[in-house]
């Protein structure tokens, strides 16, 4: 079966929301439209198409990729493909269902809930703990992140460290990450409070001097 790729960068926001009726903010929708052709660069070369209202000009295709595009909401065509979105969530599942893709070809709500757990940034805590416990030089690795459940935890974390980074448990496309030096500002405090209310926690990490990217 041919594959149909779809770029949905609002995926992490949709995961955090959890609803099949999630509506992405306009900025995320514009970002998705601007970069809708991104899957052209990693799609399998054989019998692949990308769901986009933009055309992948052969004049610009210097690598000779065997990829074509079909416009959004082409229900009669979408149902012919195995769909491959950037990420699976309940909203994109509903999108494909509404456009004729057979339910048996889509992940179940239970499977998407598993994806959601794996996408939570708390998984990085276990990952770093694993690396540190097996390293000959654990002091050369960063401290694990801390999951902060209450605003009192947030304030205590800021008081303990000179510079910190706060991250929303589910976020993507460069969003949901804020740096803090010294006292917590009112705006950042408000952001942390909203994230805790919506996502259940906020992740705190010690900020390190950047040496190399």
Q: Residue ranges of each PLM-predicted region?
A:
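Phosphate-binding site of ATP-dependent enzymes
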Residues: 162, 188-213
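Flexible loop/turn segments at secondary-structure boundaries
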Residues: 13-14, 57-59, 172-175, 210-212
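Short loop/turn segments at strand-loop or loop-helix junctions that form parts
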Residues: 5-12, 16-18, 53, 88-90, ...
């Amino acid at each position: 079966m041919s594959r149909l790729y779809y770029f949905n960068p609002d995926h992490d926001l949709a995961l955090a929301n959890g609803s099949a009726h999630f509506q992405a903010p306009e900025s995320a929708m514009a970002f998705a439209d601007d970069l809708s052709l991104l899957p052209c660069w990693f799609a399998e070369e054989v019998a692949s198409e990308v769901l986009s209202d933009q055309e992948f000009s052969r004049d610009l295709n210097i690598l000779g990729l065997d990829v074509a595009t079909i416009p959004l909401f082409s229900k009669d065509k979408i149902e012919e493909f195995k769909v491959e979105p950037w990420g699976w969530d309940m909203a994109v599942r509903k999108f494909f269902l509404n456009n004729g893709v057979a339910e048996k070809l889509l992940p179940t709500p239970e499977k998407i809930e598993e994806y959601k757990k794996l996408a939570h940034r708390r998984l990085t805590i276990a990952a770093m703990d694993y690396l540190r416990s097996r390293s000959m030089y654990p002091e050369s690795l960063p401290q694990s992140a801390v999951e902060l459940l209450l605003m009192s935890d947030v304030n205590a974390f800021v008081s303990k460290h000179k510079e910190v980074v706060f991250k929303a448990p589910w976020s993507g496309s460069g969003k949901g990450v804020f740096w803090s030096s010294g006292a917590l500002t009112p705006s950042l405090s408000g952001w942390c409070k909203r994230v805790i209310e919506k996502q259940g926690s906020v992740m705190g990490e010690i900020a390190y001097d950047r040496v190399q990217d």
